[in-house]
């Protein structure tokens, strides 16, 4: 139980800006439990975002424009910009059109290139559009918590099932200890949390299933893409995946609300 709690705290330290003052020892047990706790951290992030949105929308007259912008930036801030940085590094490397080895070197470079700036602007512009249009047409507050939960659960699967691009870095450090069993535990935890959400608010179950299918599709596409373009999975690749899949899930919700109305 101590290892499980330490693993959860390690995930919170790594994936969020929530201050955890405790020094967590890095070992095989905490690393494995940290991967298993990815869905729990995703759910925690989702609850924070949902509660913030509820307060802003229920106790103020803030416009949908402000609500959409606040929700989008909160998701980036609470992760400490970690995933956004990964998206930018991957974009710089991909649009360099170099060989795999050179792309890996570019991802490790701390400098920000023009393509990184353009790609993050494009990503956030489209996400803002999807969030804003969804809020205008009616956003179910429970779905706000589903998106981070799905993205972090999927990140655990991509981390374990994707081929590591190199033997150093964050992804390699986790892969040294975690295996497919840990990915399966993360999936079970994620599914249980989704089931709890659907039990609390049953009317969203169709949308949740649709989003889960979209997430599974995104994992397979991302795995093929990163292995072909970068030789495998890195920490930056995982960060880019989280940013990309969250934008993709917001797009799916917008499409459902605009054309299917489930």
Swiss-Prot record:
It catalyses: alpha-ribazole + adenosylcob(III)inamide-GDP = adenosylcob(III)alamin + GMP + H(+); alpha-ribazole 5'-phosphate + adenosylcob(III)inamide-GDP = adenosylcob(III)alamin 5'-phosphate + GMP + H(+). InterPro entries: CobS. Its cofactor is Mg(2+). One of its GO terms (cellular component) is plasma membrane. It comes from the Bacteria. One of its GO terms (biological process) is cobalamin biosynthetic process. The keyword Hydrolase does not apply. Pathway: Cofactor biosynthesis; adenosylcobalamin biosynthesis; adenosylcobalamin from cob(II)yrinate a,c-diamide: step 7/7. The chain crosses the membrane at residues 4-21, 37-57, 62-82, 112-132, 141-161, 181-201, 202-222, 236-256. It is a multi-pass membrane protein. One of its GO terms (molecular function) is adenosylcobinamide-GDP ribazoletransferase activity. It is found in: Cell membrane. Keywords: Cell membrane, Cobalamin biosynthesis, Magnesium, Membrane, Transferase, Transmembrane, Transmembrane helix. Its main location: membrane. Coiled coil: none annotated. Its EC number is 2.7.8.26. Pfam families: CobS. Disulfide bonds: none annotated. Belongs to the CobS family. Joins adenosylcobinamide-GDP and alpha-ribazole to generate adenosylcobalamin (Ado-cobalamin). Also synthesizes adenosylcobalamin 5'-phosphate from adenosylcobinamide-GDP and alpha-ribazole 5'-phosphate. HAMAP family: CobS (MF_00719). This is Adenosylcobinamide-GDP ribazoletransferase. It comes from Geobacillus sp. (strain WCH70).
């Amino acid at each position: 139980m101590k290892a499980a709690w330490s693993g959860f705290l390690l995930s919170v330290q790594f994936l969020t800006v929530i201050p955890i003052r405790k020094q967590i020892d890095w070992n095989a047990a905490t690393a494995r439990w940290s991967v298993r706790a990815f869905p729990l951290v995703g759910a925690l992030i989702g609850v924070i975002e949902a509660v913030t949105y509820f307060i802003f929308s229920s106790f103020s007259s803030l416009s949908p424009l402000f609500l959409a912008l606040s929700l989008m930036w909160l998701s980036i801030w609470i992760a400490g910009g970690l995933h956004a940085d990964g998206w930018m590094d991957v974009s710089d490397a991909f649009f360099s059109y170099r060989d795999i080895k050179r792309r890996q070197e570019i991802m490790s470079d701390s400098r920000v290139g023009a393509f990184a700036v353009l790609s993050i602007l494009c990503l956030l512009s489209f996400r803002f559009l999807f969030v804003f249009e969804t809020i205008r047409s009616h956003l179910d507050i429970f779905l706000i918590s589903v998106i981070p939960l799905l993205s972090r659960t999927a990140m655990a699967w991509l981390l374990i099932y994707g081929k590591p691009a190199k033997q150093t870095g964050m992804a390699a450090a986790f892969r040294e200890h975690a295996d497919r069993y840990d990915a399966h535990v993360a999936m079970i935890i994620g599914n249980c949390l989704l089931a709890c959400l659907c039990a609390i608010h049953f009317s969203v179950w169709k949308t949740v299933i649709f989003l889960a299918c979209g997430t599974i599709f995104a994992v397979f596409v991302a795995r093929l893409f990163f292995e072909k373009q970068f030789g495998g999975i890195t920490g930056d690749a995982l960060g880019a995946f989280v940013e990309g899949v969250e934008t993709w899930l917001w797009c799916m919700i917008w499409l459902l609300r605009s054309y299917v109305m489930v």
